[in-house]
Amino acid sequence: MAMSSGGSGGGVPEQEDSVLFRRGTGQSDDSDIWDDTALIKAYDKAVASFKHALKNGDICETSGKPKTTPKRKPAKKNKSQKKNTAASLQQWKVGDKCSAIWSEDGCIYPATIASIDFKRETCVVVYTGYGNREEQNLSDLLSPICEVANNIEQNAQENENESQVSTDESENSRSPGNKSDNIKPKSAPWNSFLPPPPPMPGPRLGPGKPGLKFNGPPPPPPPPPPHLLSCWLPPFPSGPPIIPPPPPICPDSLDDADALGSMLISWYMSGYHTGYYMGFRQNQKEGRCSHSLN
């Protein structure tokens, strides 16, 4: 049997509509290899055929509603279970101490049973220390031990939060020169954070020597006027005296009142140190004069 020399060698001829990609069709290597036109056409063709079949009723459209599962009937309680439930409800009586969940916040509080309605299986409890009265189901009442355990858990959580806050405050207030002063009171007078006077250079003269009228640094300056305090930033925690902080780096977070308060405080502190320096120089001058007279 002779085979024809032409053609594709006896293979089944390919249909042009079903060919999505053919390699070596004479295109150059620079052609766009990401051309997905054929894929888009095939997708549109598949979608169109599906819509056509759906329109003719060959495919049933699935509804978006979930299938309803048959409800499970509650298991019938036998007589022994009913007796146990009745016994658990009968154990509470008026005046018993218990723990109840307050409906406002969902927390457990100690309470005392004021009245009981066994027909409705409810009771009225009075919260210890608060005096609030609330109706509760007898099955929802808890023993006082549950309340104690809940308080222990709440106290542990509060202690953990307080320790976390104190740790954050100590890390923020720690400086290279003062690392041991971690615990500081919440409020302090104004002069507690004034900067210390500069150290006295050279040997310091003791009290009682002739010609000495300026002994040591001057007393701390009085608090600034109230109108300065109203413009100043919130007070800093007490502790060793520190230098007033510079103004914030970001100018957007500083309004006119804060900037004015910072400027007035800087003038006030500058005057304090200027007075100390002038007094120190006057002390040195009078000391030299007294030594020359002797």
Curated annotation (Swiss-Prot):
Species the sequence originates in: Homo sapiens (Human)
Tissue specificity of this protein: Expressed in a wide variety of tissues. Expressed at high levels in brain, kidney and liver, moderate levels in skeletal and cardiac muscle, and low levels in fibroblasts and lymphocytes. Also seen at high levels in spinal cord. Present in osteoclasts and mononuclear cells (at protein level).
UniProt keyword list: Acetylation, Cell projection, Cytoplasm, Disease variant, Isopeptide bond, mRNA processing, mRNA splicing, Neurodegeneration, Neurogenesis, Nucleus, Phosphoprotein, RNA-binding, Ubl conjugation
Region (Disordered) location: 1-32, 59-88, 156-222
Encoding gene (name): SMN1
Modified residues (Phosphoserine): S4, S5, S8, S28, S31, S187
Impact noted for substituting G275S: In SMA3; impairs homooligomerization
Name assigned to this protein: Survival motor neuron protein
Result for mutant: E134K: Impairs SMN binding to RPP20/POP7. Abolishes the interaction with ELAVL4. Abolishes interaction with SNRPD1 and SNRPD3. Impairs binding to substrate containing dimethylated arginine
Subunit structure: Homooligomer; may form higher order homooligomers in the dimer to octamer range. Part of the core SMN complex that contains SMN1, GEMIN2/SIP1, DDX20/GEMIN3, GEMIN4, GEMIN5, GEMIN6, GEMIN7, GEMIN8 and STRAP/UNRIP. Part of the SMN-Sm complex that contains SMN1, GEMIN2/SIP1, DDX20/GEMIN3, GEMIN4, GEMIN5, GEMIN6, GEMIN7, GEMIN8, STRAP/UNRIP and the Sm proteins SNRPB, SNRPD1, SNRPD2, SNRPD3, SNRPE, SNRPF and SNRPG. Component of an import snRNP complex composed of KPNB1, RNUT1, SMN1 and ZNF259.
